[in-house]
């Protein structure tokens, strides 16, 4: 248990980071086990509200892989993936939209609004925030999408009014066809359009590791050339590939830094943003 001096010291140590990031924008991709565990979810909500209360603008982008897989299992549909990206047929697409927009998004908004009136739920469809196109254009019955365009005005409007946008990673193309888009990619594209200070991806791993079976091999700081080298060496594999790729694109689009951190660590966001050591991998140009 911390004594009063230690509590004050922690606040004092955080002050330079509070001053540095006040008024800046962070885009947080929320996913992984932190979505399934009620306690961890409450801590993420606390972190987001704390950051908002100290003057940091926060945008949340979420997927909902575990919940989607749960409901697919209920209707006897086998989840399919390609290089860490979900393959989405017509039946899966309908379920994905119901789960992400109708369940996960509204649950997050409700939790945030228990302690504030700040959260506003959106999907990529709202105000055409995200315009999608097919990730697999040669495949007819595949509604896995990618970000074609971002119309960021609605997010800017909400942020300027003090709200916390909560965005589900479902969007439509120009013809109104719905697509399921990887939430990391949506978060990266939104961060890029906002010129965000940070893009933060909450995952189930400590970050990027030279040995995926050894958490002590966490690499704390990497630049783009180092990331490309790790990809070529097949150290970065599977579901980590789209995460790293969206971080690289965001960095090239003037996002100052990207972070891949373990969302199962209590108060992971505050530890990464308001301490000098951080807890995950920080990616820069």
UniProtKB/Swiss-Prot annotation:
GO terms for biological process: arginine biosynthetic process via ornithine; L-arginine biosynthetic process. GO terms for molecular function: acetylglutamate kinase activity; ATP binding. Substrate binds at residues 64-65, 86, 180. It is found in: Plastid, Chloroplast. It catalyses: N-acetyl-L-glutamate + ATP = N-acetyl-L-glutamyl 5-phosphate + ADP. Its EC number is 2.7.2.8. The record marks 29, 243 as: Transition state stabilizer. GO terms for cellular component: chloroplast. Keywords: Amino-acid biosynthesis, Arginine biosynthesis, ATP-binding, Chloroplast, Kinase, Nucleotide-binding, Plastid, Transferase. Pathway: Amino-acid biosynthesis; L-arginine biosynthesis; N(2)-acetyl-L-ornithine from L-glutamate: step 2/4. InterPro entries: AceGlu_kinase-like_sf (IPR036393), AcgluKinase_fam (IPR004662), ArgB (IPR037528), Asp/Glu/Uridylate_kinase (IPR001048), Glu/AcGlu_kinase (IPR001057), NAGK-C (IPR041727). Belongs to the acetylglutamate kinase family. ArgB subfamily. Catalyzes the ATP-dependent phosphorylation of N-acetyl-L-glutamate. PANTHER family: N-ACETYLGLUTAMATE SYNTHASE, N-ACETYLGLUTAMATE SYNTHASE, MITOCHONDRIAL. This is Acetylglutamate kinase.
């Amino acid at each position: 248990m911390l004594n009063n001096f230690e509590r004050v010291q922690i606040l004092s140590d955080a002050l330079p980071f509070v001053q540095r990031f006040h008024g800046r924008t962070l885009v947080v991709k929320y996913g992984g086990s932190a979505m399934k565990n009620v306690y961890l979810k409450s801590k993420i909500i606390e972190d987001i509200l704390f950051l908002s209360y100290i003057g940091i603008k926060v945008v949340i982008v979420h997927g909902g892989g575990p919940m989607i897989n749960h409901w697919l299992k209920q209707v006897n549909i086998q989840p399919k993936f390609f290089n860490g990206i979900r393959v989405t047929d017509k039946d899966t697409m309908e379920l994905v939209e119901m789960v992400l927009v109708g369940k996960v998004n509204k649950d997050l908004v409700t939790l945030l609004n228990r302690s504030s009136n700040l959260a506003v739920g959106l999907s990529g469809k709202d105000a055409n925030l995200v315009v999608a196109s097919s990730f697999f254009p040669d495949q007819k019955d595949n509604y896995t999408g990618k970000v074609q365009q971002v119309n960021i005005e609605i997010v800017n409007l909400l942020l300027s009014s003090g709200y916390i946008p909560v965005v589900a990673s479902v969007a439509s193309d120009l013809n109104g066809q719905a697509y399921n888009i990887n939430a990391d990619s949506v978060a990266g594209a939104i961060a890029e359009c906002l010129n965000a200070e940070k893009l933060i991806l909450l995952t189930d791993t400590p970050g990027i590791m030279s040995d995926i079976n050894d958490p002590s091999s966490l690499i704390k700081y990497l630049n783009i050339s180092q990331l490309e080298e790790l990809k070529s060496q097949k150290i970065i594999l599977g579901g980590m590939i789209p995460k790293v790729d969206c971080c690289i694109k965001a960095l090239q689009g003037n996002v100052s830094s990207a972070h891949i951190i373990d969302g199962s660590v209590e108060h992971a966001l505050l530890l990464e943003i308001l301490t000098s050591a951080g807890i995950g991998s920080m990616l820069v140009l």
